[in-house]
Amino acid sequence: MSERFGREQTSFSWHPVCPESLSGMGIPRSPIRVIGESGRAVLEGNAKIKNREGKDVTAMLLQGCNASIEALERANVFAFVYMEGSPSCGVYRTTLKNNRMGKPPGVFGAMLLDRDFFLIPANDLQSPVRRWDWKRRLYAFAWAKEVDINSKDDLFQFWHIVKFLCQEIDEKTAREIGKRLAELPKGFDKESAETLRHEVMMILRQPSSLEKIKNRLWKHYMYFKRKTGVELENVMEPTDMRNMNHIADELMLMEKTSFSTEVLFGAAPILYRGR
């Protein structure tokens, strides 16, 4: 899975965990399913997990899920690449049969959601544009999680850096945040600042769309062109036809050029240049 990041895979620390394997079910194992409302109901004691033979493996899976969470938290991991369709790790579906959704979230998926993990569906990493979208939001999420906000100036600077990305993902919520910031009373309230930080992080967990990505790319490119006078022939208008690899190349070119000219690329405001 990590090889899909190419040379960038070394920019991350990988900690493979599988709650089903850590439960002791082994590989290969009998398929399991949720008997009840959802994986969250399993955590609440109101549903069970059974394998194909009808054996109750609820306790085993819960032990595997707890062991996985402990391993991730011990390593200070806050992003997780999950397999959609799994009754344990699935977030929005817990089966791969036909077009059914199953009973989401899965048991481990519910635990990850409750702990505000940055969640990346493994299948999305096959698309160069979706992979770019997850990567840029992950970098912004990690920065937003760790950056110090100890004054009103810090808070305004924090929002200035992430606001364009937040507006792309969820314009309504981003506009509401901007309005609240403009109406802040005098002084600095740490609790309110942390609430805003959390709101931003929750926005950054959401994927964008291809249409939004292309439109924002063009908008930022036109700003960059006016500011620097530099033309990038490979960056095309939103309505121009091209494949996903070309779009991803445009996005990465915009990142690289913005970084070298010190012009903020609002669609990807946090760029990581290696450890």
Set out the residue ranges of the language-model regions.
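Glycine-rich phosphate-binding loop signature in dinucleotide/nucleotide-binding domains
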Residues: 72-76
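Divalent-metal-activated hydrolytic enzyme cores
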Residues: 43-67, 101-193, 203, 207
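Extended non-globular C-terminal regions
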Residues: 191-275
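Short Gly/Thr/Asp-enriched flexible loops that form oxyanion-binding sites at enzyme active sites
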Residues: 85-110
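Short connector loops at secondary-structure junctions
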Residues: 15-31, 122-131
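Short catalytic helix/loop segments, enriched in acidic residues and glycine
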Residues: 1-16
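Charged, often glycine-rich, active-site loop that binds/positions anionic groups
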Residues: 28-46
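Short beta-strand segments
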Residues: 18, 81-85
